[in-house]
Regions:
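Substrate-binding groove/exosite segments of carbohydrate-active enzymes
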Residues: 216-220, 268-378, 436-466, 471-472
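Terminal accessory carbohydrate-recognition/targeting modules of carbohydrate-active enzymes
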Residues: 1-285, 329, 333, 447, ...
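The feature captures the catalytic groove of carbohydrate-active enzymes
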Residues: 221-256, 347-356, 360, 376-377, ...
Length: 621
């Protein structure tokens, strides 16, 4: 009978995920759509293809990546719900998605996102970042630096940064808010009240009502929404946390690190890999932030460079892994390569998200072993490379020729002479085009622009800087890029709103202009922008196939002095610095040379920021 009752029990109608009615407070991308078409009556599309821009945050070596939109909306569970924030001032409510005086930034270039709104004579700062305390959490805190007390509303919304969602049930139990049976938000203190909306009613329209005693809401159409409201006096901060796993620890809030502590941790990871002291400017700021956010591409076992975008090319994963290796994140790359090798099937293939990444893995492994020699890792990967080579020979695709050359280099490196010799007879020369064509329509492929900057860095450094300048102009205030962008609105139109493939190519391009080991000689300072004239630069411990490279420039009047050191570099190493002195040729792994007088070249490279100052100079110890 129990089985029969379950079989004949009325089933809840399945409603497709859709945006709430137009009279609701909508996400930022819908507001931008209305602004763009200038027709408030026209219904917005059900999926976001007009403003695909956001910023990712998360923990190191974690599969959880959380998107924060330009107004602070947090997509906690894509396709289901997000967490918004609103402010109440004298019975008037401000919605950041609709407000013009909102700006966004990172804390010290780390994936700690601050959304700032100017209100009541000061700033209110909304912060989002990830932390680990016996589990993973997204910390959400709001600080009142305004001159007056405010009301803060945190709203569970049945939509996200890409389109509609679905929420059936919301319940508040003391300081814990649950969505569809799962703990969704843990508050630092008990909320003052809960405002709920169902049946098509937006709780945003009920915020000033004080009679509500509701503690839960159920909506069969999947449009449940609820708002917790707390007072926020001047100088105070309200903290809460979104668990990224199963937890009911209501006492976790005091244990969570501060935003500054988390930002410092990210910065230490970047500096421990390699360190740079560059003149202040937009490129420097983006380079600093990009080297940190690049780590978000790693899940610990693989790379996810473009969350929210359809698969593109397996070589994008290779470029991301190579960027991690070239930026000095040796341990991260090692763990990913070992994880992929363990997943290799009997035929020699390895896949990721149903995509063959065998060749991409071999290419990345070759570069990783080239810039950071690791005999134990090389031997551990040798069988993987041999089996993968057999698979690639039997199943050639675009990029196979490059992958086979990489495989040959690895086999030579581990002393597998017979296998390397057999493979060398099968290698096909790689013919690359001289230049990459970028589409010149209003929807710009940002991934290709970044890729072309990297390629140009080897052959035409000044043109590479101009590409980097264009790329920098398309970056968000939080140093992120979408996959495709409208060149007029500067908003994403396709793919991922924060595409770490762009970040990877950008980092590789800047690194190649600073330290390039592509040819038989070591090239440093490939280009020297006018804004750097008479300013010192320091580069420390950049991985290369010659060894870890450090160099610095000091100025003596109009003459730059170049110091360089390559750990373990060959005694006959040739060093050039064409951006400073095209006639200079240094020899040896260590040296110092006073170069020819240099004058600004009037290269139209990039516009610097308003910051001033010069880098310090000193030894590499």
């Amino acid at each position: 009978m129990t089985i029969l009752r379950q079989f004949f029990r009325p089933r809840r109608p399945q409603v497709r995920r859709q945006l709430p009615p137009s009279h609701w407070v909508q996400p930022w991308w819908v507001e931008r759509y209305k602004e763009q078409i200038k027709n408030q009556k026209l219904e917005p599309p059900q999926s976001n293809n007009v403003a695909r821009s956001w910023t990712l945050t998360g923990n190191l070596d974690s599969s959880h990546r959380i998107a924060v939109d330009p107004r602070g909306l947090i997509t906690v569970k894509p396709g289901s719900w997000s967490l918004d924030w609103w402010l109440g001032v004298d019975q008037t409510w401000l919605y950041p998605a609709q407000h013009g005086s909102v700006r966004q930034r990172l804390v010290d270039g780390a994936p700690v996102v601050e959304t700032v709104i100017r209100v009541a004579g000061g700033d209110v700062i909304h912060r989002v970042y990830a932390a680990r305390v016996d589990g993973e959490y997204i910390v959400v805190e709001v600080e009142n630096r305004a001159s007056r007390p405010l009301a803060l509303a945190l709203a569970v919304r049945p939509y996200d940064h890409l389109g509609g969602g679905r929420v059936d049930q919301i319940e508040l139990n003391d300081r814990t808010l649950s969505v569809d049976g799962d703990v969704a938000l843990i508050c630092g203190r008990s909320p003052g009240r809960l405002v709920v909306g169902t049946g098509g009613v937006d709780p945003a329209s009920l915020l000033n009502q004080t009679a509500s005693t509701d503690r839960s809401i159920t909506c069969e159409t999947g449009m449940a929404s609820a708002v917790i409201i707390v007072p926020l006096v001047h100088g105070s901060t309200f903290r809460s946390a979104v668990p990224l796993g199963y937890t009911n620890d209501a006492q976790v809030i005091p244990k969570l690190p501060s935003a500054q502590q988390v930002a410092s941790g990210w910065g230490k990871h970047a500096v421990s890999a390699c360190r740079f002291v560059l003149p202040p400017g937009l490129i420097n700021d983006l380079f600093d932030a990009s080297r940190q956010s690049l780590l978000l591409a790693s899940t610990g076992k693989d790379v996810e460079p473009a969350p929210g975008a359809p698969p593109r090319e397996s070589t994008d994963g290779a470029a991301t892994l190579m960027a991690l290796a070239e930026a000095g994140y040796r341990t991260t790359v090692r763990e990913i390569l070992i994880s992929r090798a363990k997943r290799q099937d009997r035929l020699g293939a390895v896949t990721h998200r149903n995509q063959d990444v065998t060749g991409a893995t071999v290419i990345a492994a070759d570069r990783a072993l080239e810039v950071a020699p690791d005999p134990s890792l090389a031997h551990a990967l040798s069988e993987f490379v041999a089996d993968g080579t057999r698979w690639m020979l039997a199943n050639p695709v675009d990029g196979t020729a490059e992958a086979l050359i990489a495989a040959h280099k690895i086999l030579v490196r581990v002393g597998a002479e017979k296998a390397a010799r057999e493979l060398s007879n099968l290698l096909i020369p790689i013919v690359k085009s001289d230049e990459t064509t970028i589409e010149q329509d209003e929807n710009l492929d940002v991934v290709e622009l970044a890729r072309s900057a990297f390629e140009l860095a080897a052959t035409d450094p000044p043109e590479a800087w101009r590409s980097l300048e264009k790329l920098a102009s398309l970056a968000s205030p939080t140093s992120s890029w979408p996959s495709r962008v409208n060149s007029n609105t500067r908003r994403g139109t396709g793919g991922a709103g924060h595409d770490l493939r762009v970040t990877a190519w950008f980092v590789r391009a800047v690194l190649r202009l600073l330290v390039d080991d592509k040819d038989e000689c070591l090239r440093v300072a490939a280009v020297w922008p006018d804004q750097w004239h008479a300013q010192g630069v320091e580069v420390h411990q950049v991985p290369s196939r010659f060894g870890a490279v450090s160099w610095a420039v000091r100025w003596h009047g109009d003459r730059p002095a170049l110091l360089w050191e390559v750990e373990g570099g060959p005694s006959d190493l040739m060093v050039i610095a064409p951006g400073l002195d095209s006639t200079f040729q240094g020899e040896g792994p260590m040296g110092e040379q006073l170069l020819a007088p240099a004058a600004p070249q009037n290269h139209d490279v990039w516009a610097p920021s308003d910051q001033g100052g010069t880098s310090s100079s000193g030894s590499f110890s």
